[in-house]
A protein has these predicted regions:
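Extracytoplasmic catalytic/substrate-binding loops of multi-pass membrane glycan-assembly enzymes
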Residues: 136-148, 156-172, 176, 180-181, ...
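Specific aromatic-rich, kink-prone transmembrane helix
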Residues: 244-264, 280, 297-298, 546-550
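Membrane-interface anchor segments at the N-terminal boundary of transmembrane helices
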Residues: 53, 188-189, 427-518, 522
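Start-transfer (signal-anchor) and selected internal transmembrane alpha helices
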Residues: 1-23, 50-129, 554-559
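Short acidic/glycine- and proline-prone juxtamembrane loop motifs at membrane-interface regions
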Residues: 234-245, 286
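Membrane-proximal stem/loop segments at transmembrane-domain junctions that anchor or position
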Residues: 335-465
Length: 559
């Protein structure tokens, strides 16, 4: 380690410096966007005059941080793990303990040993979700769930939200209403089902780490992380598609790791390929960008796994087929309306709107093209961190008629207003990549909208424990943790993006290039999320759920 610190290992210094520049840029750009709304503010202090001066000053600090992280990871890799440490021995007996107590203890231990590890983890994680469930009974009935149910029961079936998730919600509410039960009971059943699914996925992750002989510190840390990290319990009882989607995305990640690390075993027969197809299909059925996430990985997997290209192509074509059938014949059969294409153009919407509001250079002939799609009154609704106010007034039909001309105009305006476009993108995506965002939160509430409409669900929060309710409200709605340094960062989705960046840098430093494929789905998902309407914590939750896998990827030496 001393030799490395004195520069004999030039490679580690190069990558530490590279990482220092990257993280310093994230940190200072985030600070400027958070406090000033723009990167281009000029300071009277010569040390902070421009964004480039600010980044340069922070580079040494972050270079040291990356260097220490790399050295720590190298040390952890070099340690020999004692997988049996801390576990009871079957044959051991305490000479001082009473025989009856010892017999009972051994009997309990023997009974526990006979329970499959997966079931034990599953039960443990389910129990760990109960505090959030009891503190916010019947759960966080918020986000899109009220509209998903209200729209469907009103006769408007739309693929704007995933129909699989909408179908489950509506099925449970239909059943409970038919039985004369309350909407609170229906919401509770939805959340218990979600708790069971997420606990099972967490159990799968824990068993994967044990099977891959992860070090004891990692699998114990994983158990503690899944049980104690408050957002896991809150997301488990949050009736949003993002909860199960996040878990399924991590399962897809595990499939990619297995097919890349042991391809001979993985592609022997069709069992694993079929399971991967089911998992990938669930991903696209739970979120529209799930399809783009996995499809974007296929070319890279084909290059590395060319020997197994036939099965990979079958898998990819199957995914395309499921997506095509779902968005075509299936929607027609059930009479569902397709999702609005404007969801794909959030960056276009935000950049043009900010340019207009900021008084940027938009020429009259360009406004003639823009106005039928977004008029001046619409663009004046611009909100830096959320595209919905403008997007909801975006005229998709007019856009589709002149799509090429509109996008050409957008590009031309951007060429003259580069700084405004950059500011618009960074403001909308800030929460994804900056750990110190002040307004990041996960509301611990129930939404009861359209109170006079019988088609809509009417769910009221009835906490079974007031102190648990106060705790989770402080963590979520009030975001009180934002006042506590370090804790603030640990509970920020931006930190987990930084972990993803650190993992990528470390793998390149170690020349373990093929392992970049292991985390490729996370990068692809993040890429699609950056094009979304906002940086919400539930959108960044997949990175939090995948945290143990990122640590495993960095720890695991390439064979």
């Amino acid at each position: 380690m001393t030799d490395k610190l004195h520069g004999k290992n030039l490679r580690i210094w190069i990558f530490a410096l590279l990482g220092g520049i990257v993280f310093a840029a994230f940190d200072r750009c985030g600070y400027m966007i958070q406090h000033y709304g723009t990167l281009w503010a000029i300071s009277e202090n010569p040390l902070h005059k421009t964004i480039f001066h600010r980044i340069l000053i922070r580079v040494p600090l972050f270079t040291a941080g990356v260097l220490i992280s790399f050295l720590l990871l190298n040390w952890l890799r070099g340690r020999s793990t004692d997988s049996g440490a801390g576990l009871p021995k079957r044959g051991s007996q305490g000479s001082t303990a009473p025989q009856t107590a010892m017999a009972k203890s051994l009997a309990l231990y023997s009974a526990a040993q006979n329970i499959p590890a997966f079931i034990k983890y599953w039960i443990l994680y389910f129990i760990s979700f109960l505090p959030a469930f009891l503190g916010g009974y019947p759960g966080l009935f918020a986000a899109d769930a009220p509209n998903q149910i209200g729209w469907t029961f009103s006769g408007w079936l739309t693929a704007h939200h995933p129909l699989l998730h909408t179908g489950i919600l509506c099925g449970i509410f239909s059943m409970t209403r038919a039985l004369g039960w309350s909407d609170n009971t229906a919401a509770a059943l939805c959340n218990v089902l979600q708790m069971i699914i997420l606990a099972g996925i967490f159990a799968w992750i824990s068993c994967f780490l044990k099977k891959k002989q992860a070090p004891q510190w990692l699998w114990i840390g994983t158990v503690l992380f899944f049980c104690l990290f408050p957002f896991h319990g809150m997301m488990a009882v949050y009736t949003t598609k993002d909860t199960v989607f996040s878990g399924v995305l991590v399962l897809c990640l595990l499939q990619v790791i297995c097919m890349c690390s042991t391809p001979e075993e993985y592609f022997k027969g069709w069992r694993h390929t079929i399971f991967a197809g089911i998992t990938f299909s669930l991903l696209l059925l739970l979120r529209n960008n799930g399809f783009h996430t996995m499809l974007a990985c296929v070319p890279f997997l084909l290059i590395y796994l060319w020997k197994y290209r036939k099965k990979l192509l079958v898998l990819a074509l199957g995914l395309v087929l499921v997506y095509g059938v779902y968005n075509g014949p299936f929607l027609n059969v059930i009479g569902a309306e397709s999702g609005n294409a404007r969801e794909m153009y959030n960056i276009v919407i935000q950049t043009l709107s900010r340019t207009y509001v900021a008084g940027g250079d938009i020429r009259p002939e360009e406004m003639d093209v823009i106005r039928p799609v977004m008029d001046e009154e619409t663009m004046a609704l611009y909100t830096p961190n959320l595209s919905d106010p403008v997007k909801n007034q975006f005229h998709t039909d007019a856009f589709e008629e002149e799509k090429a001309e509109f996008l050409k105009t957008w590009f031309q305006v951007g060429c003259r207003n580069k700084k405004i476009y950059i500011d618009a993108f960074l403001n909308t995506t800030l929460g994804f990549w900056y750990p110190d965002v002040e307004d990041e939160y996960l509301e611990f509430v129930c939404f009861d909208i359209q109170k006079d409409d019988p088609h809509y669900p009417h769910v009221q929060m009835e906490p079974k424990s007031e102190w648990l309710n106060r705790y989770y409200t402080a963590i979520g709605t009030d975001a009180s943790f934002r006042q506590i340094p370090i804790v603030r960062e640990l509970l920020s989705m931006g930190l987990y993006f930084w972990l993803l960046v650190l993992a990528s840098l470390y793998l390149i430093y170690q020349k373990e290039y093929r392992k970049l494929l292991w985390i490729l789905p996370l990068w692809m998902y993040l890429g699609t999320s950056l094009l979304g309407p906002a940086a919400l914590l539930r959108y960044g939750y997949p990175l939090m759920a995948a945290c143990p896998i990122l640590l495993f990827t960095m720890w695991k030496k390439e064979a």
